[in-house]
Structure formats: structure tokens, C-alpha cells
């Protein structure tokens, strides 16, 4: 009988962890809908139809939009 108490505690902890993990049990998707990952956000860009004159296009975003990154400008006086 003393073995059953740690067994039930272990099962309870595992069930709580499975509920709290994002992927669910064995990486299966839960009922929560996640937004698709946009690689443009990794570089702190923004998805637009056209880039501004101070921006450069680096990647492509979903729906055929452009990933616009701010062009690093260093003004030096000569």
C-alpha cells in the first residue's frame, strides 16, 4: 500500500504538466488555435505592400507582402 501514494502523486503531476505544456501530450496540438509564425517579426520588420524610402525589403511575408526593415543609417560628417 505505501507504493500507491507516490504513484498517484506522480500521475497527478504528469497530468498537470501535460495540461500546461503548449504542445500537449506527445506534441499533439490542443484545441487552442495559434497564429502562424512570421519570420519577418524575428528581424523586427513589418509586413507591408510597399516599403518606405528609408526601408529595405529583406524577406517575403504571407499574402505576397514585403518584409520591410528599417535601413541602418549612420550619418558621419566629413
UniProtKB/Swiss-Prot annotation:
Keyword Ribonucleoprotein: no
GO CC entries: extracellular region
Position of the signal peptide: 1-23
Cysteine disulfide partners in this protein: 40-67, 47-61, 51-68
Annotated GO biological process: defense response to bacterium; innate immune response
Keywords, sorted A to Z: Antibiotic, Antimicrobial, Defensin, Disulfide bond, Secreted, Signal
InterPro entries: Beta_defensin_dom
Key word Secreted present: yes
Compartment(s) where it occurs, according to its Swiss-Prot or TrEMBL record: Secreted
Pfam families found in the cross-reference section: Defensin_beta_2
Main location: secreted
Entry's family note: Belongs to the beta-defensin family.
Functional note: Has antibacterial activity.
Protein name (Swiss-Prot/TrEMBL): Beta-defensin 29
Gene from which the chain derives: Defb29
